[in-house]
Amino acid sequence: MLTIRKLNKKEDFESKLTKQQFIDFLYEHLGKFGDTKEAIEKSIDYACSDEKGKGGFLLAAYYKENLVGELIINNTGMSDYIPEHFLVYVAVDSKYRGKGFGGELVKKSIEICEGNVALHVEYDNPAKRLYERLGFYTKYAEM
C-alpha cells in the first residue's frame, strides 16, 4: 500500500526526509526531463513560502517504508485566466515505475488543490500519456 505524506512548510522536513534528500530524489529520478538542483530548491522554497501569492505543497510517497515518489505543486496566486496551481515536478523511482504510483501522486495532488491545475510536459515524455488519462489536455502551444 502506498502512503502519501504532504509537506507544505519547511518545518515538515525531518530526519527521515530532509529538504536536500527531497531535492536529490527529484534530481535523480526526473532524469533528462528534470532541472538543476537549484531550480528544484527554488520550487520547494516557493511551495513552502508564506508570502502572499505564493505557496503550494510537496508530496512524498512511500511503499513499504521506501521513498518511491515525489511531487511539487506551486500556487500561481491567480485564477480565472490562469490555473491556480502548477504541477512543477513529479517523479517515481525507476525501480517502482509501472505500478501506478505516479498516477496516485497526481490524483492526490488534484484532490488537495482547490482550483485548476496545469503542467508542462515535453512531447516525448512517457508521462504525457498518464497526464492525458488523468484528464489533462493541451490547450495552448507555449512559445
Residue locations for each model-derived region?
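Conserved active-site alpha-helix within GNAT-family acetyltransferase domains
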Residues: 103, 118, 123-142
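N-terminal first-folded block
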Residues: 28-35, 46
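Conserved acetyl-CoA pyrophosphate-binding loop and the N-cap/start of the following alpha-helix
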Residues: 96, 100-108
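Conserved acetyl-CoA binding element of GNAT-fold acetyltransferases
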Residues: 81-94, 120-122
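A short helix-loop-beta-strand connector motif used in the catalytic cores of GNAT acetyltransferases and
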Residues: 46-60
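Conserved N-terminal entry element of GNAT/NAT acetyltransferase domains
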Residues: 1-28
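Conserved beta-strand in the GNAT
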Residues: 58-60, 66-75, 86, 91
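Alpha-helix C-terminal capping segments
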Residues: 17-20, 105-115
